[in-house]
Amino acid sequence: MNREIMLIFGTAGVPISAEDEFKAVDVLRKLNLGAMELEFVKGVYMKEDYAKKLKEYGEDIIFSAHAPHYINLNANEEEKVENSIRRIIKTAKVLNNCGKNLVFHPGYYLKRSKEVTYNRIKSNIQRILDKLEALNLNVMLRPETTGKTTQFGDIDETLKLCFELNILPCIDFSHIYARSRGVINDYNSFYKILEKVENVLGKEAIKDMHIHLSGIEYGKGGERRHLPLNESNFNYRDVLKALKDFDASGTVICESPMLEYDAVLLMKCYNEL
């Protein structure tokens, strides 16, 4: 399997048919999936030793991590900002033992302007980067494109942030679709997103992508909830076609409630293109 020139598919968290992370590795191998995102969305439950052993057992699996959802680097209360930074650092300490890509939602606008929010979030991510360097933690922070219009993280501000901080994004195409309330849902629109990534961050960013895909339901304010791929109008096939035509490589994490079943569906669909 040449990982340099292709997309590796995997699950957001432990597959449905596995009891824990070690059994998850067995399930992923059996299904020819090659990645798993450790879901710390409700808190960083994993110890560093466990992560090290997990990587030894799953040496062929690409592990990433999703930091807790209780993060707002634009919070009004300084204590909430400090707690958010701590949660990302805690995620990084665990991930450093088994993987590289650390996905997080940077925060909410609250009542601030986009510009003020951007500057506050940028400055707090810089603080995190300084701490990661001081602790010698070799992880890549990946701010995610977000699905709700109240959340910081449209495609343009995410790419600008990554360019200015020399980090890389997590491109969640389902969120982009939901945030646009279904407007961004065809091959040309998805291809244009990849062109934006390349224009802002260079070809290297296309060769080292971290992507989230899932069926999704949206309302007036964007994302409502994740759905199985085939229970949503999200046009995942055109996303895969755009990725293939653009010669993108990296990892694709399936966040559908059907986890490994939909991850296999994505992989098969991509391989048949």
Swiss-Prot record:
This is Uncharacterized protein MJ0133. Transmembrane segments: none annotated. GO terms for biological process: base-excision repair. It comes from Methanocaldococcus jannaschii (strain ATCC 43067 / DSM 2661 / JAL-1 / JCM 10045 / NBRC 100440). It comes from the Archaea. GO terms for molecular function: DNA binding; DNA-(apurinic or apyrimidinic site) endonuclease activity; phosphoric diester hydrolase activity; zinc ion binding.
